[in-house]
Design a protein with these regions (language model features):
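Acidic/His- and Gly-rich active-site-bordering loop/insert found
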Residues: 21-128, 137-159, 168
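Surface-exposed loop and adjacent secondary-structure segments within mature catalytic domains
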Residues: 169-175
Length: 175
């Protein structure tokens, strides 16, 4: 009986160690994926910053994210819920389903140059005071990293990036 108990504890410990190693490896690979896409993600964020489109008018911004998702192998559905700038980008199949929101709308009247002092890029124009250029881009970057892990067979399931317009003023998170 003691041998069986000792063997069971040893096996459980080995499985736990293998699982912990697997999780560490996946975390490392996720980070490497983000680093691999860093230049592309920075360009995306910068382009959305420059577009600075307000609620339901984020046509350039949504296209930038849609194009990047397609280049990275996602299936994209545009015009979700009848909202022209809403979209989903999905990869994989089955469960779990990992959903990631990505906002990209700007605020009216807060245009800003990339400077630490107040200086409008376009006087009276829209700007990204809440950092949605970063949020939308970073969220898509996370979805890409997860997609690559699904593709490698390291994790199972589906990842869905929800391109979320009009977060600042209307209702986009409810669709």
């Amino acid at each position: 009986m003691k041998r069986i108990l000792l063997l069971s504890i040893t096996l459980i410990s080995a499985v736990y160690y293998i699982e912990a190693q697997s999780i560490r490896t996946i975390k490392k690979e996720l980070q490497q994926s983000i680093e691999k896409h860093e230049t592309e993600l920075i360009k995306t964020s910068d382009a959305i910053w420059e577009a600075a489109e307000t609620a339901l008018l984020e046509f350039k911004s949504s296209k930038i994210l849609i194009d990047q998702a397609k280049r990275n192998g996602f299936d994209v559905e545009e015009g979700v819920a009848g909202i022209k700038t809403a979209f989903t980008a999905s990869y994989g199949s089955g469960r779990p389903i990992i959903g990631i929101l990505g906002e990209f709308d700007a605020n009216a009247g807060i245009s800003q140059k990339r400077k630490p002092v107040k200086e409008a890029r376009i006087p009276g124009g829209a700007g990204h005071g809440c950092g949605h250029n970063l949020f939308g881009t970073a969220s898509l970057g996370a979805a890409i990293a997860i997609k690559e892990q699904i593709e490698k067979g390291n994790i199972k399931g589906t990842v869905i990036f929800y391109g979320t317009p009009a977060e600042e003023t209307i209702f986009a998170k409810v669709w």
